[in-house]
Amino acid sequence: MAHKKGGGTTRNGRDSESKRLGVKVYGGQVINAGGIIIRQRGTKVHPGENVGMGKDHTLFALTDGKVAFVIKGALQRQYVTVVPA
C-alpha cells in the first residue's frame, strides 16, 4: 500500500508573456525615421507632427529628428512630435 496520499492539483500555474509596452525613446532624444517611440494599448499618447500610428496604436517617427512630448487642447491630451533636426 502507498504510504503517501495522491498529490493534489491546482487550477493556477499560468501567466501571459509580458508585452514590453511603454516609451522606447524619451523627450529630447534623437530618432531616425521609422523608429518606434511608444508601444501602447489604446491612445494614451496621441501622434503629433511627423509621428505616425500603427494599427496596434504604436507611435513611430515619420522623419529624422528630436522627440518632444506636449500636452495641449481642452482635454489636456498628451501628444508626441518629432522636430526635424
UniProtKB/Swiss-Prot annotation:
GO terms for molecular function: structural constituent of ribosome. GO terms for biological process: translation. Residues 1-20 are annotated as: Disordered. Gene3D superfamilies: 2.40.50.100. Keywords: Ribonucleoprotein, Ribosomal protein. It comes from the Bacteria. PROSITE patterns: RIBOSOMAL_L27 (PS00831). The keyword Cell wall biogenesis/degradation does not apply. InterPro entries: Ribosomal_bL27, Ribosomal_bL27_CS. GO terms for cellular component: cytosolic large ribosomal subunit. The keyword Signal does not apply. Belongs to the bacterial ribosomal protein bL27 family. This is Large ribosomal subunit protein bL27. It comes from Herminiimonas arsenicoxydans. The gene is rpmA.
